[in-house]
Amino acid sequence: METRNILENLSCIDHSYSLSEADAFAGLSKYISEEASIRSCAKCEAALVKAHLKLRGQLTDAIASELDKVAENIDPQEVYTEEEKTKHNIRALVNVMKTKVNAEIGPLIHLGATSVDILDTALSCRMRDVTQNVVLPDL
């Protein structure tokens, strides 16, 4: 029997349909799975830090690259493990991200944002991307 990582699910009933529509599922999963949601939130947090640093005149290419790398390579399982302690998804993400950036940048992660700001912005970005990269090309 074939198995998949549950963080790649699109909904709670995916196991019933993901194998019969594997190509469609793979295309959608990159954008609307739980794993994609975590990565998208991390990208929003990174963009917020870059905005703070840019306003201060402190954003360098190296820092921007570091933030992009952290966001792209965030480990969803590590975030879930942290969430077991914090009982809060975005606080868990912020805590994990802070361990992966320079100590001087850490306090800027999530500064001035609410969890809903991050979740809604990330969702909007994912819906834009899945529409442009999966839905429209398949029409």
Could you tell me what each predicted segment is?
Residues 2-139:
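A helix-coil-helix interface module used to build multimeric assemblies
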